[in-house]
Amino acid sequence: MATQTFDKIVWERRLQILETSLGADIMHYMHQDDVTEVMVNPDGKLWIDRFGVGFEDTGIRMDPDKTKRVIYAIADLSGNTINLKVDPSLQADIPASRLFSNCRFQAELPGLVDAPSFNIRKHSKSVYTLADYVTQGSMTKSQHDAI
C-alpha cells in the first residue's frame, strides 16, 4: 500500500515537472483536437501541424534550456535515460495522463543538432483521406489517382 502511494506521488510530481516545462503555450496546443503535432526546431521556433491545414509557425520561441528541460522531463516520465556520448536523442512514448492522451516523442540534442529540438505526435482524432493528403501537399493528384 505504501509503495503504491509513493509511486502515485512520484508519478504526479513527474507530471507537474512536465507540465511546467512545457508551459502554457504548448499545453494549449496539446489540448486542441485539430493539432496533431507540436514541434520545436533547433532555432527555437514552435511549430504545430493542424489537421486539414498543415504546418504553422506559432510565432512562439523557446530557448534551448527550456527545450532541454522538456526533453529530460519526458525521458524521466517515460522511464528512459539519455546518454549524450552514445546517442544524444530520445524516442519515447508519453503515457496517457491527466495532461493529455498518449503521444509519441522524438528529440535530438547537441551532438546531432546545433540546439535541442523535439516533436510530439498526438494520435489524431480524425482520419486522413487521400484527398486530405493531396490538399496538404503530402501527395500529388497523380499519386492519388494511381492509388
Q: For the regions a protein language model found, what residue spans apply to each?
A:
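P-loop NTP-binding catalytic core
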Residues: 49, 55-146
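Generic hydrophobic alpha-helical segments
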Residues: 26, 146-147
